[in-house]
Amino acid sequence: MRSLVGDLVLVRLQEERDPLLHKRLYNALRRAILDGSLAPQSRLPPSRDLAGELGVSRNTILTTYEQLLAEGYVVSRRGSGTFVAQTAPESSLTAKEERENNSLAAPTAHLSRRGQHLLGQVSASPRQWGAFIPGVPDVNAFPHPLFSKIQARISRRPKPERLSYSCNGGTPELQQALVDYLRVSRGVHCQSDQILITEGIHQAIDLVTRMLCDNGDLAWVEEPSYWGIRHVLAMNDVRAEPLTVDANGLCPPETVDDAPRLIFVTPSHQYPLGAVMSLERRQRLLALARQQGSWIVEDDYDSEFRFSGQPIPALQGLVADAPVVYIGTFSKTLYPGLRLGYVVIPRPLVSDLKHAHAELYRGGHSLIQMALAEFITAGHYSAHIRRMRLLYSRRRAFLTELIQRHCMPYALSDFSDNAGLHLILNLPAEADDVAIAREANARHILVRPLSRYYLTAAHKKGLLMGFASQPEEQMASAFSVLLGCLQTHCPQMLLLREDAEKQNAPT
């Protein structure tokens, strides 16, 4: 006849999935102790008896008991046996306590108002891979074997200092590689000590905002703009003033009543609308920044991916000693999970920003930085970008053709400049782009609503559609699903079947 503990363990064993029997047994007993099914001070059967009840070897039971004993879940009393400990070693709540507490308090009950505000504004999606996701490259096209080979060789005998924290803003190899690359490809003028390696654009924006702004300071942002900028500003109690964007980029005001401390711009390819800032606007913005004592933060977004014409040189290199903090990332050219970006720091700020970065973030990833430096200097990086430019150009043309075949002529963005990794599908003013995106996301179509990129209520409606990450056949299949969402929410923007057939008929 089995004991109560034996019956309990048999039931719990059926719920465990580990291939190793002793681990399934350990997990079953541990879970029973934590949720109160095995009460404190209750006696466990002798190892020989429990082995017989369960039909397993005694060694399996002994191994399990020893593990529970070592971790403090049970205690052994000489001559008396093995007992459940009075207090489980877990510092977290038991499942029962957790359920009771969750019924009494909201998840954000102990967050600061700032933290609650941040979570209330969350825009990052838990899904970061799929059809039409904006800003994500084709990570499968990255030369992983080549990069892994470089990494393996560098990691074979690393110097000890390469395995510690980095307090110099990155490895000298990557800093110099970026100086040379940015000078040739983007017209950026700097020396290697002005390069600071970060863990992406977000960290760069946070560092610059923390170090250059006080509470209540003003920052200009493009309208619409990258939501991450607005969130970082809000978290640092910096006011964000949206400035209109037209076909020539950000529109600086004629007069300035309240001087901004920072001016955030994406002049080479405005995010998300795609406009290129004209030379006249760039010169006006530089003059205004000097006059007002402001710093321009230039996010050189998608500058590598122009599919016609010549790349637009960076704002940073337009004049000597420009009041520009230039930031970039490898997320779009290589892959987002690399988590490497960079800042070109103006000379007067170099020492302070590097020291602040070391204190706030404790930089690292030195071996990956060295591998990336070799990848760049050996010419692999430029070659990869050239290959991707051709691939993305074809995919952009394919998505453009899909939209033109099925949607009204106004569906493609006015500001499209044949660059970047996404298109904007314009929607009628009365459409609810958030609802459309929500329904599409539920069907694993990862479009983003354009209205969410605006700070004010006067916003356009549309969908950001990335074309880089997925091949043409997957885009075609996903577009059919998206058409179903559009048919439900705004059928007026779709061409009738006979109109579509006429438009696509050979002439």
What spans do the regions from the language model cover?
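N-terminal basic, amphipathic alpha-helical segments
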Residues: 1-154, 348, 354, 358-365, ...
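Active-site PLP attachment segment
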Residues: 319-352
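Hydrophobic residues in well-ordered beta-strands that form the structural core
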Residues: 221, 242, 298, 372, ...
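Short glycine-rich anion-binding loops that position phosphate/pyrophosphate groups of nucleotides
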Residues: 137, 267-271, 332
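Helix-loop "lid/cap" segments that line or gate small-molecule binding pockets
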Residues: 342, 370-378
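AMP-binding (ANL) adenylation modules
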Residues: 453-457
